[in-house]
Amino acid sequence: MDIAEEAAKNSYSPYSRFPVGAALECSDGTVFTGCNVENAALGSTICAERTAACKAVSEGHRDFVRIAIWGESRDYCMPCGACRQFLSEFSTEMEVLCAKAGGRYVSYKLRELLPHTFNY
């Protein structure tokens, strides 16, 4: 979770002022980080989870086992619907750790957060 919190420091979030960081672990132990990157055209914003996943895929990794998501919030920082669907393309069994300020976190399997994925 510390790695995800550290990744949030690189966030570009001038509109929401809500920095988020993610650390995505692959089956070989490689970890890819990501942060949210906002844009004035809000639909162009990319979440921390998808940033980390795109970095992993671009480096040849698709075997995701765990993702930690950290946001400076009183509530647990849960992945949005788009991120849930995006990650499910690679594994519905991956562990999703959702943290909040103060170091507490909850853990789910991705399939619990998105029980009915879209498949083409």
Please identify what each model-predicted range represents.
Residues 35, 43-50, 54, 75-90:
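Local cysteine-cluster metal-coordination motifs and their immediate loop/turn environment
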Residues 39-40, 113:
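A short acidic/small-residue loop/turn micro-motif
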Residues 1-10, 59-120:
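C-terminal binding/interaction regions
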Residues 12-15:
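Short Gly/Pro-enriched turn/cap motifs at secondary-structure boundaries
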